[in-house]
């Protein structure tokens, strides 16, 4: 009799184990990755609305952060996440909020804008360029200028002199741009080799050389670069994470000498799963997947370009289309 009473329990336990094992073995999906331990104060910020963070993005970002804290790699009280499936340029000067700053110790959450990799159009060969609003193409190839989703840890910050620019009729300013190096793992492990990091979305255009021997930045002949300041927060990057200059100062300061984690969504598995679902005519919710609905409608389906496939194409393209000799920077006229 005792054996009979135990058997149903054993079968019940075994069935539960089978379910758990099946879930653990299945591909990562939005449905499986429900974050049950999201703090109550953070829950109102979770969702698909503007300024909110998708649940799967938050869950992975939190998991990465606490893993690195346990490993002793990170001691920063804050961590970062990016949802690169959301729109960047909303039009009419408005930018989408898809870079997230989360500090659980002081219960703060902030969403700001951030650019994505522009990709490239290799005329007559292949096209993996992205528009300003939504990213369709992702990848980890060197010189691809694409965003690669996955895990990163912030590294050292380097600040470099870019030149001078005019702020008023009688006043010039110096552009010193900081760059935070990211170190990746797995598919993003070549982040340092790709020079992937974070920086302000600003540069100097129409640069010429102006005589200014008293400048601490003057070259050996007494010249300094001078150009027009261009801010491109609503534009695209070479694969890096770019912020508006006003946001960048605060974000970079948070990272200085205090490494932390950055999780960028989507990864290649997510992209492949979404593409398969689109081909099958499945909705994202029905397939247990996540992609911003507005951008998915615009791009049709996303694509991941792995480095082992794309780098040989890029290398051949560079051999067939060598860059012209670099011209010397012209001397400024009357500036």
Residue ranges and their predicted role:
Residues 12-25:
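Bacterial N-terminal signal peptides
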Residues 243:
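A conserved hydrophobic position in a structured secondary element of the catalytic/binding core
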Residues 32-238, 246-335:
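Cell wall/extracellular polymer interaction/catalysis modules
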Residues 27-31:
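Sec/Tat signal peptide C-region and signal peptidase I cleavage site
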């Amino acid at each position: 009799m005792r054996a009979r009473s135990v058997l149903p329990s054993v079968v019940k336990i075994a069935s539960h184990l089978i379910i758990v094992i099946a879930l653990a073995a299945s591909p990562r999906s939005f449905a499986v990755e429900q974050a049950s331990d999201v703090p109550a104060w953070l829950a109102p910020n979770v969702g698909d609305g503007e300024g909110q963070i998708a649940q799967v993005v938050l869950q992975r970002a939190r998991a990465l952060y606490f893993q690195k804290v346990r490993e002793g790699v990170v001691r920063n009280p804050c961590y970062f996440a990016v949802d690169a499936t959301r729109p960047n340029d909303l039009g009419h000067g408005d930018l989408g909020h898809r870079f997230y700053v989360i500090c659980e110790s002081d219960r703060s959450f902030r969403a700001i804008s951030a650019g994505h990799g522009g990709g490239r159009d290799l005329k007559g060969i292949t096209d993996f360029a992205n528009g300003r609003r939504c990213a369709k193409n992702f990848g980890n190839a060197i010189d691809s200028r694409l965003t690669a989703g996955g895990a990163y840890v912030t590294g050292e910050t380097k600040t470099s002199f870019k030149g001078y620019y005019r702020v008023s009729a009688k006043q010039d300013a110096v552009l010193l741009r900081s760059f935070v190096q990211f170190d990746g793992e797995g598919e993003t492990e070549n982040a340092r080799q790709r020079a992937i990091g974070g920086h302000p979305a600003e540069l100097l255009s129409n640069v010429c050389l102006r005589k200014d021997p008293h400048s601490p930045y003057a070259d050996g002949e007494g010249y300094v670069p001078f150009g027009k300041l261009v801010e491109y927060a609503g534009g695209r990057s070479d694969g890096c994470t770019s912020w508006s200059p006003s946001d960048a100062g605060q974000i970079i300061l948070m990272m200085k000498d205090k490494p932390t984690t950055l999780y960028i969504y989507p990864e290649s598995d997510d992209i492949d799963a979404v593409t398969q679902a689109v081909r099958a005519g499945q909705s994202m919710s029905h397939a247990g997947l996540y992609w911003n609905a507005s951008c998915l409608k615009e791009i049709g389906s996303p694509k991941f370009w792995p480095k082992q496939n794309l780098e040989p194409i890029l290398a051949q393209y560079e051999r067939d289309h060598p860059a012209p000799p670099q011209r010397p920077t012209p001397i400024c006229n009357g500036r």
